[in-house]
């Protein structure tokens, strides 16, 4: 009898505990925690005043969770998250004054409608800049009132009730799901916010910026500087998720000494999300032996097929490329360390760019910079966006490739078909690069960076030293001038035909 009584009491106790847990969960579902990391002895009065004016959603309770923040915001927010049972948590910078009293109610309503929405903010970025700093992006949306400067910063209009972003800013971050904050990586006041958004993304949850006609908050201080240690930690952990993949295409043929230098320049890129696709059609195994030292590097994809023609060797990496952007690196050329980062930044942040190029230097076999009249002087005095049509005329007028070779440029994935088309056409042009640039520039502008971001090596083994190649190039220029002249009118048409006639006359005079 006693055993039956004990069993009944245990069942009753378990039922009470379950009921209490369910009641607690229900209370948590109707609870909002406002979490703030205090940097001084007390919270700013402006912050507290704006909090007192907030409208409390019907049926909800609200609590203020205040924690010490000087050890880092990720650690502080993690501590506060564990201390609160509230389903809805709103993490706010203490230097923020809320301007919309109904903001919390809006956030809760949005969460209740969108189960897959993990995190909401008042500003953010759709694409990160290659350096990982959200405020360097030109794809930002939302707005902020700056109290100190008495002005509003409007980055971009938010479409609809809310718009998805890659990362929201840490001024205000609201969640309906608890995930650990990366206090193991971030010990200051930067990068923790973008990192948290990417942690939500890893779990299939979206981040979004609230729609707004006017700023929802006012910022009363200055931004925290982006610490270098935090930036490096952020890129090491999230670059492959946050940044577009860039494919570096490296055809090589029996030049292992130069190739090794080229490969090392690709591996030294400051941009953190690259793949390097090497196609080797050497008839010997020197390059293959060299590549064994790089076997552990997951960024490199190497194949060796001596049966490939020179053009097939160019095409193989193009077909295997997975990147949003791509660039060739020929086995005797070099990249500057920041080439991909600088160029990917432009392509990801500006609309209407066909491709991006830069100044390049000529170097000799030893790597010494040498003069080259085809490269200097610069076509523009400062980094510039050149209208596509103007760039085409610049090429034809001077019959000089100021844009550069395939190593020099960075192209969007959409350019792959044009590159493939130019490389496979018969008869093959002697100006494969110029032909490609002119076709691409029919559909967009050229971004020219005046800094030197690549190096074109001049040496005895190049086909460009062959006089027959020079003659073929001259004929190709004459053909391009005539083809373009057919589409023009007036003086421009006349001048192009005259230039083509002059080239052909000079070739005839030399018996070519």
What residue spans do the PLM features occupy?
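Flexible acidic/His/Gly-enriched loops in nucleotide-sugar-dependent glycosyltransferase catalytic domains
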Residues: 133-163, 307-315, 319, 341-421, ...
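Short, well-formed alpha-helical segments that are part of the catalytic scaffolds
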Residues: 14-25, 40-56, 254-268
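Short aromatic/hydrophobic "clamp" motif used to bind/position activated sugar donors
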Residues: 89, 326
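Conserved nucleotide-sugar donor-binding catalytic segment
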Residues: 174-175, 179-188, 377-470
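Catalytic core of nucleotide-sugar-dependent glycosyltransferases
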Residues: 224-243, 380-389, 429, 452, ...
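A conserved hydrophobic helix/loop-capping motif in glycosyltransferases and polysaccharide synthases
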Residues: 30-42, 246-258, 262, 269-270, ...
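A conserved acidic beta->alpha catalytic loop
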Residues: 38-52, 56-58, 68-70, 97, ...
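Glycine-rich, basic loop-to-helix element that forms the pyrophosphate-binding segment
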Residues: 70-84, 305-321
């Amino acid at each position: 009898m006693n055993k039956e009584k004990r069993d009944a009491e245990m069942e009753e106790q378990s039922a009470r505990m379950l009921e209490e847990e369910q009641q607690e969960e229900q209370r948590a579902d109707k609870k909002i925690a406002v979490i703030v990391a205090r940097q001084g002895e007390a919270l700013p009065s402006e912050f507290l005043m704006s909090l007192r004016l907030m409208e409390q959603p019907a049926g909800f309770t609200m609590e203020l969770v205040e924690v010490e923040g000087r050890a880092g915001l990720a650690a502080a927010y993690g501590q506060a998250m564990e201390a609160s049972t509230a389903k809805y948590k709103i993490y706010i910078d203490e230097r923020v004054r809320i301007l919309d009293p109904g903001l919390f109610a809006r956030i809760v309503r949005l969460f209740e409608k969108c189960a897959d929405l993990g995190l909401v903010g008042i500003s953010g970025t759709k694409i990160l800049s290659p350096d990982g700093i959200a405020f360097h992006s030109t794809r930002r949306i939302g707005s902020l009132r700056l109290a100190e400067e008495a002005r509003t910063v409007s980055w971009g209009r938010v479409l609809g009730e809310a718009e998805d972003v890659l990362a929201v800013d840490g001024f205000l971050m609201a969640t309906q799901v608890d995930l650990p904050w990366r206090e193991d990586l971030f010990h200051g006041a930067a990068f923790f916010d973008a990192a948290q958004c990417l942690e939500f993304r890893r779990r299939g949850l979206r981040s979004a910026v609230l729609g707004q006609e006017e700023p929802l908050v006012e910022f009363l201080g200055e931004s925290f500087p982006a610490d270098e240690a935090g930036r490096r930690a952020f890129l090491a952990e999230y670059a492959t998720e946050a940044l577009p993949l860039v494919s570096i295409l490296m055809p090589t043929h029996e030049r292992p000494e130069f190739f090794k230098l080229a490969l090392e320049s690709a591996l030294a890129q400051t941009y953190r999300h690259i793949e390097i696709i090497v196609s080797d059609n050497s008839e010997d195994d020197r390059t293959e032996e060299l590549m064994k030292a790089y076997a552990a590097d997951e960024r490199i994809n190497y194949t060796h097929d001596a049966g490939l023609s020179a053009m097939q060797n160019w095409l193989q990496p193009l077909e295997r490329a997975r990147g949003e952007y791509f660039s060739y690196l020929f086995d005797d050329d070099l990249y500057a360390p920041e080439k991909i980062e600088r160029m990917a930044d432009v392509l990801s942040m500006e609309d209407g760019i066909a491709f991006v190029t830069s100044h390049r230097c000529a170097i000799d076999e030893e790597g010494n910079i040498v003069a080259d009249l085809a490269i200097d002087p610069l076509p523009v005095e400062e980094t510039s966006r050149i209208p596509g049509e103007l760039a085409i005329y610049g090429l034809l007028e001077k019959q000089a490739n100021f844009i550069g070779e395939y190593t020099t440029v960075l192209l969007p994935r959409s350019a792959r078909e044009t590159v493939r088309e130019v490389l496979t056409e018969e008869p093959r042009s002697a100006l494969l690069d110029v032909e490609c640039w002119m076709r691409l520039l029919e559909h967009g502008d050229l971004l020219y960076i005046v800094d030197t971001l690549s190096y074109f090596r001049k040496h005895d083994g190049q086909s460009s030293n062959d006089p027959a190649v020079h003659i073929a190039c001259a004929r190709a220029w004459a053909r391009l001038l005539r083809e373009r002249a057919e589409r023009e009118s007036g003086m421009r048409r006349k001048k192009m035909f005259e230039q083509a006639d002059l080239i052909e006359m000079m070739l005839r005079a030399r018996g070519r």
